Amino acid sequence: MIWFNKRIQIVPCEVSPRVCFSAAANFVGSGVLGGIGVVTLTKVKHRRELLFASLPTLFAIHQFTEGFVWLGLDGYLKPAATHYWGEAFMLFAQGLLPFLMPLSVQLFEPNTPSRRRMVPFTILGGITTLYMLWALMSFPTSIYVQGNSIVYINPGTQITALAAIYIICTCGSLFFSKEPPMVLFGGANLLALLFVMAVKRYAFTSLWCAYAAFASVIILAYFWQSRALRPFLYTKHA
């Protein structure tokens, strides 16, 4: 067990081809998502669409960072490097995503009434993000492999009530969108979340982010199919 600045502890796993395969899977998945992200961004027609359209690219970068976490856990990277990659993964998964998701939906909505419906989710997401960032900086995080998955444990974020708030922040705003594909994306994320909670709750942070990333193909499909209908007028009224 190795300690880093009293904040992250990495538990190296035994040398195993499984870990190399898992790292490769993350890197390949990141490349696929990166391609999806680039194509999605080429379909953007208004600055308000940019953050939501950037989600596949952000997920691609996120999966890329976890590939290095896998390599670090298997001893291919120096402990300090593994520490930084683990921090980067947790920063996005638990620190930024609860705020970025509702904000991206709020910006994308075409009129003021729709955007106002998103405000509570964005505010809650902002508060959640502030707490998550504080917890990640204040409590030690353990990172280790269990059941072929990476487990990220932080005492400050491992709270049931906080998990419920996290779900509301990341999925809730999508269900209140006027755009059916966004509701579909929210449903896909929620189903993935429930599946992970039922099957591998201990590896929730890693696996749900992976499933959510690949569900972002729905975002590409939406931008592709709606390119003739956008950009929205972004009016003040419905």
Residue ranges and their predicted role:
Residues 15-20, 83-92, 146-161:
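Short aromatic-rich membrane-water interface segments that cap or initiate transmembrane helices
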Residues 2-35:
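Hydrophobic transmembrane alpha-helical segments in integral membrane proteins
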